[in-house]
Amino acid sequence: MKKLNIGDYNDILNEVLNDISPTEVEKKELKVFSDKIIAKIKDISKKPVVDIIQVGSTARDANLKDDHDIDIFLRFERETDRDTLKESGLKIGKEVIDYFNGKSWVEYAEHPYVSGEIEKFNLDIVPCYGIENCEKIISAVDRTPLHNEFLIMSYKNKNLSDDIRLLKKFLKGLGIYGSDLKTAGFSGYLCELLILKYGGFLTLISDVKTWKPTKSIVLNEIYEMYDLKKDHVFSKFDDPLVVYDPVDLNRNVAAALNEENLCKFIFYSKMFLKNPSKDFFYGFDKKITDFLNRRERGYLLTLEIKRPENIVEDVIYPQMEKIQKSINKLVKEHDFEYLRYQNFADENTCYLSWEFLVNELPSVKLRIGPPVYSEPGVMNFITHNEHYFVKGCNVCAYKTRKYKNIQILFEDIVNGKFRKIITYPKYVCPENAEIRLGTFVERT
């Protein structure tokens, strides 16, 4: 394998590359199999299908070892109605996978598409509309073939595959690879754009160490594609990282990335450059979690809520986050402090977990009122509080807590006593949930 000219980091990064790069045999198998699939689709498809394109990392030699995912997009004429697009896409997808004796099923995004398994290969056959750069999309996936065309054109005479693989593996090691709403990290497309912008993995992270939230990136190719001047004013986005999409300048490719994961990327880029190690590339986030959990725990509590059937992760995770933040506000109002909280969903159950500093508070709390010289405020305070007194310069009172035990508070949450206070998303309802004490469910 070709050595990377990266000085002191050379040995470590090439060791990682030897672990994660597909062999020439693997690449050939992917190419031969993909060609068979495309040939069969061409054989059975007709108008309004106007083009068949393989997209994704395996189409661009940007995949990791043992990644056998093949993404095929069927581009339909713009005038095609959605029902025809949906029905034709599903029919073609199922027929192709059946022809190769594979197993197929329907997945759902904005519209349904066919996924399948044929031998060791995972296949998605996705219908979309044929559009041009910066044209208004008709369905959410219409840009994907344009992304593929842009990257292939931009990669000419550039050898970036190894650097893309290193970045993906680095982000996987940190637990921040993936643009799904559960992960809120970096998409594969974003990784490829970053490597294209900076020309290599090490060059990228050397710059990343200086980043701050609100960082904005415009690829040089964008100015050439659209004949823009260097002082062109681009659309504004309120996101931690902004990377303008070359095929749609009104879209931020990094929109799914949250601030914490951006800051992890910044911090661990600094750490890797200071103390280079293979450890960063292999389950580093799990090692950090395990290390931090080797301590005396606070009071652990988990709500287990039945997960509705057929609700995808990109729906269920935002709803878990929404209700957990609403509960967080309630517990803070009752003076309970938590060290951390987390949510996770498996096939059947949603888990909302907390680690509290204490589970029991004193029966009495100090309520601090306005300064004694604030006449209207003082009179209002003493009207609503018995046994008032002056502490420092404020009028104060002792109040009996309504909830001194966190378990009792959560029992009332589960019994529906806060229905008018807590935000109830459509699919994650805390009523009739099971309370598990001494348990904190980590994300996997």
UniProtKB/Swiss-Prot annotation:
Subunit and partners: Homodimer.
Binding site for CTP: S57, R60, H147, K168, Y177
Sorted UniProt keywords: ATP-binding, Magnesium, Metal-binding, Nucleotide-binding, Nucleotidyltransferase, RNA repair, RNA-binding, Transferase, tRNA processing
Function text: Catalyzes the addition and repair of the essential 3'-terminal CCA sequence in tRNAs without using a nucleic acid template. Adds these three nucleotides in the order of C, C, and A to the tRNA nucleotide-73, using CTP and ATP as substrates and producing inorganic pyrophosphate. tRNA 3'-terminal CCA addition is required both for tRNA processing and repair. Also involved in tRNA surveillance by mediating tandem CCA addition to generate a CCACCA at the 3' terminus of unstable tRNAs. While stable tRNAs receive only 3'-terminal CCA, unstable tRNAs are marked with CCACCA and rapidly degraded.
Entry's family note: Belongs to the tRNA nucleotidyltransferase/poly(A) polymerase family. Archaeal CCA-adding enzyme subfamily.
NCBIfam families: cca_archaeal
Residues at which Mg(2+) binds: D69, D71, D124
Miscellaneous notes: A single active site specifically recognizes both ATP and CTP and is responsible for their addition.
Record EC number: 2.7.7.72
CDD domains hit by this protein: NT_2-5OAS_ClassI-CCAase
Gene name of the encoded protein: cca
Domain of life: Archaea
Keyword Transferase assigned: yes
GO molecular function terms attached to this record: ATP binding; CCA tRNA nucleotidyltransferase activity; magnesium ion binding; tRNA binding
PANTHER family from the UniProt entry: CCA-ADDING ENZYME
Protein name (Swiss-Prot/TrEMBL): CCA-adding enzyme
Keyword Cell membrane appears in the UniProt entry: no
Biological process, per Gene Ontology: RNA repair; tRNA 3'-terminal CCA addition
Cofactor(s) required, per the database record: Mg(2+)
TM segment ranges: none
Enzyme class: transferase
Catalytic activity: a tRNA precursor + 2 CTP + ATP = a tRNA with a 3' CCA end + 3 diphosphate; a tRNA with a 3' CCA end + 2 CTP + ATP = a tRNA with a 3' CCACCA end + 3 diphosphate
Chain sites annotated for binding ATP: S57, R60, H147, K168, Y177
UniProt cross-references to Pfam families, sorted A to Z: CAA_C (PF21133), NTP_transf_2 (PF01909), tRNA_NucTransf2 (PF09249)
